[in-house]
Amino acid sequence: MSAAIAALAASYGSGSGSESDSDSESSRCPLPAADSLMHLTKSPSSKPSLAVAVDSAPEVAVKEDLETGVHLDPAVKEVQYNPTYETMFAPEFGPENPFRTQQMAAPRNMLSGYAEPAHINDFMFEQQRRTFATYGYALDPSLDNHQVSAKYIGSVEEAEKNQGLTVFETGQKKTEKRKKFKENDASNIDGFLGPWAKYVDEKDVAKPSEEEQKELDEITAKRQKKGKQEEEKPGEEKTILHVKEMYDYQGRSYLHIPQDVGVNLRSTMPPEKCYLPKKQIHVWSGHTKGVSAVRLFPLSGHLLLSCSMDCKIKLWEVYGERRCLRTFIGHSKAVRDICFNTAGTQFLSAAYDRYLKLWDTETGQCISRFTNRKVPYCVKFNPDEDKQNLFVAGMSDKKIVQWDIRSGEIVQEYDRHLGAVNTIVFVDENRRFVSTSDDKSLRVWEWDIPVDFKYIAEPSMHSMPAVTLSPNGKWLACQSMDNQILIFGAQNRFRLNKKKIFKGHMVAGYACQVDFSPDMSYVISGDGNGKLNIWDWKTTKLYSRFKAHDKVCIGAVWHPHETSKVITCGWDGLIKLWD
């Protein structure tokens, strides 16, 4: 048996080699004896067969080809082995939903189906999209239009009619050429037309005759006259006195500064120490619409002037019974701004009816009216004693206009702003004034010189529709529309003080008035939510904030002789006194 196995091994080795190898092998290994191979001889009664079957290339179980038997998660992005096609596209593991439609049962990676990345020419896509939006047809995207003749989706009839034109193509317009008069014979000197010939259907436009021109002039004159009559007429001025007697037993009017209120109202010195107001002590109600602005009587502050969107101006007592003394009626639209002269005997009012009016504070008489047919947004008297006949007004047509009360004429115009002028404030002992505008700039002007010598406009700046000078005359507080109060120096360079920026209130869109306490320890301002905000001047910390009005708190004034009295006004039509 062992001899037979050896012989088989020898024959197995020789089967795969060349002839030379087999010759060398036979020379080295001796042939087995004939007796040992007797069992391999043919049997006469049976077919020849081998007792041992040998497979030269047996199947081997390779580790990489083994399937794990685990279903693939459709969300998996990476597989560590080579799965078969059946594994990759096997249905999702789990019970099938019998109520799913064919579209819902199909594999999806978004709500409406399966989206695959594809390269599309941006121009071609936009061309077909716009064509479909304009004409109602587009090329069928499911067909290869290079191989198949163009097929359209949408309005096929329109596509055939336009011969498949897209929005970026223009078809030839079937229009007849305009015919010209022909006379090309150059020898005809008078009648030769050549290329300058007129069109057959061309109409000559002639200048009107003298008679027609006269008629036209008469018609235009009538229209202009009619238009002038339709222009807004100034409202009739009248006044209402709300107290029984205008003068007291000594013959003094309400302009007389009282001396029995516990405070020296004639003093020029501010109080030594100011305190935070905490409670409401009085409400002045009389306006039927929102109050636009409040102004205290110059120096003493014993009277309060208010203007409102109900077209009225009212004068109130700050001390005593706090009555409404007089109402001034004369504007046909909302009053925007008011300003006392230095003595307080007269005041100006600016309204949306395009009129500026000068009133007598004591009698209520309207002394004069001014207009340049533009809306005045702010008005200011020149504070100098020798210039009480001059005032400036910021207009909606980007100009600052200077009027003389005595003549009623415009004597100067400052027209460098690029937007409507919002505020005017006198600085530097009234030799200069600062103006702000909707063009987001701040300009400084010398009095009576219509060229600004200082222009401040940073890219980060916003419009500043409310500006106030500090009591010591050194700083300008500007209400910026990005919800912060900016402080500029009011002497020499007018630089922004970056250490003094007051934040924490919401004023975007509202020209809320800013004011200082008399001792320069606090800064106050209303906001769009009807709250009164009080900051510390030194630290810029927000000390106090409380609800003052139901609507926008547009004005806030600290009484110049009181330690903690603040007057606020709002769009709820009320004026409130806080202490």
UniProtKB/Swiss-Prot annotation:
Parts of the chain that traverse the membrane: none
WD repeats (start-end): 286-326, 330-369, 371-413, 416-455, 459-498, 504-545, 548-578
InterPro entries: PRPF17 (IPR032847), WD40/YVTN_repeat-like_dom_sf (IPR015943), WD40_repeat_CS (IPR019775), WD40_repeat_dom_sf (IPR036322), WD40_rpt (IPR001680)
GO CC annotation: catalytic step 2 spliceosome; nuclear speck; nucleoplasm; U2-type catalytic step 2 spliceosome
Keywords: Disease variant, Intellectual disability, mRNA processing, mRNA splicing, Nucleus, Phosphoprotein, Repeat, Spliceosome, WD repeat
Stretch list, region Disordered: 1-47, 204-237
GO MF, one example: RNA binding
CDD domains: WD40 (cd00200)
Main subcellular localisation: nucleus
Known role: Required for pre-mRNA splicing as component of the activated spliceosome. Plays an important role in embryonic brain development; this function does not require proline isomerization.
PANTHER family for this protein: PRE-MRNA-PROCESSING FACTOR 17
Connected disease: Pontocerebellar hypoplasia 15: A form of pontocerebellar hypoplasia, a disorder characterized by structural defects of the pons and cerebellum, evident upon brain imaging. PCH15 is a severe autosomal recessive form characterized by progressive microcephaly, and poor or absent psychomotor development with severely impaired intellectual development apparent from birth. Other features may include spastic quadriplegia, early-onset seizures, and chronic anemia and thrombocytopenia.
Identification of the protein by name: Pre-mRNA-processing factor 17
Source species of the chain: Homo sapiens (Human)
